[in-house]
């Protein structure tokens, strides 16, 4: 049983920070993750405050094992557990897709560095606090996040809501509520039943006519790989300029 997950500084699970500060018990699944914030270290006796290089001293990087899954499967591992509590549907879909592809690649003999690099790039595009190997490969010291929040290379920007889906032709109608969409944009559609649909726009139609772009206030249609529902939310995926890229 091997994990792909966000790591907690309370390895035993006995953490009371969230309960003490926010009245939300981590041990009952309600952790507010205030350990992820920046903290200073102060000696209460001498009133001396330590100047530390990284303020996020209680926020470990996320565990990622996909690049050495072949070694673990060689060793006999047969169950990989993926944790996604408090993560968006796009995180759940993309991470499970990558790890499933890795297992299949190992089984059919096509697991290689090129595929690992592609999986790594995709995993960096959704919520993460940077990645490390855990202690699987002999590392003795932990690695810690260098910023608060996500280090994802992409962000989702809400632009439209679902109106109708035409099953026979696989086309969905949406209404733009902000921003714009262009042919070639990468999009994410989410909903309670739909889950997460991710694809690149190949064609946009407004009043049944092909257009290069649609803007706020317009109704438009496009081919969608899976069924969507009214009130589903459509996001445009945009690249994030990170001040510091997580390793």
Where are these regions (language model features)?
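Glycine-rich, positively charged active-site loop/lid region within alpha/beta enzyme cores that binds
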Residues: 11-54
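Active-site mouth loops of central-metabolism enzymes
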Residues: 51-64
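Beta-strand/loop-dominated core regions that host nucleotide or nucleotide-derived cofactor-binding catalytic loops
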Residues: 146, 152-247
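Extended, alpha-helix-rich binding/interface surfaces that flank or overlap catalytic cores
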Residues: 82
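Conserved active-site and cofactor/substrate-binding residues in soluble primary-metabolism enzymes
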Residues: 26, 30, 63-67, 75, ...
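Short, small-residue-biased leader/transition segments that mark boundaries at the very start
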Residues: 2-3
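Catalytic cores of alpha/beta
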Residues: 10, 17, 64-78, 94-98
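Anionic-ligand-binding alpha/beta catalytic cores of soluble enzymes and soluble regulatory domains
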Residues: 85-161
